[in-house]
Amino acid sequence: VTFVKNPEVKRKEFLSLHNMMWLNIFDSTYAYYYALIRMPEKIPALFKDHMLSTVSFLSPCRPMMEMIENQVFLSQKMYAKVIGRSETLLPFCEKMHYELVSLHVQIQTAAAYAMLGKHHDARQLLQKALGHAMPDGFLIPFVENYTYIKDVLSSINSIASEPFTDRILSLGSVYEQHCLRLSSRNSRPEILNMLNS
């Protein structure tokens, strides 16, 4: 296995092979990663410039791609856009039984409300999402959005402390510090280099 340090090299290879499926997977992976560590300038153009509507996806793929684009909107501080898009995305997820994507979108929407200072709306959505996630222990979607939801989550936890919420707050704090280190080094985890092999 040869590791390529520059993702653009692999991207050009996919383009030369006319392998659009792999190119879209590659772009969506990098879009989500860079959105999570809040480096929107590095997000691939398909997502950064919000051109998903120009790509033909099979219907089952669409909610996940839209969820990734929501994360990009959050990283670009386009909070009202997240809220507006979620109004149509959540019913679509429910219709197709995409509970995990729906959970992510609920949390992203709560994050957008929190960033706009609408803490009541954020709290309602987070409490609903916590209720859905707790039985299965789905921590990561909350941790990934910790920076946006930490204040609202802390206020929920101060009223009714739960071990599940305590874990989110603890992991979220560590995650936030890790993201800051990554973005300050302008780097990416070695594991993503496997996508370039």
Model-predicted regions and their roles:
Residues Y32, Q71, G172-Y175:
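A broadly conserved detector of short glycine/acidic/proline-rich loop/turn motifs that flank catalytic sites
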Residues T2-E13, M39-S53, A80-L90, H120-A129, ...:
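Alpha-helical repeat scaffolds
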Residues V1-T2, F14-Y30, E41, S53-I68, ...:
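Alpha-solenoid helical repeat architecture
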Residues N6, S28, Y33-L36:
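Intrinsically disordered and other compositionally biased segments
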Residues K81-G84, T88, M96-S197:
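C-terminal non-catalytic interaction modules
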Residues L74, R85, C93:
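Predominantly extracellular beta-rich ligand-binding scaffolds that present long acidic/polar faces
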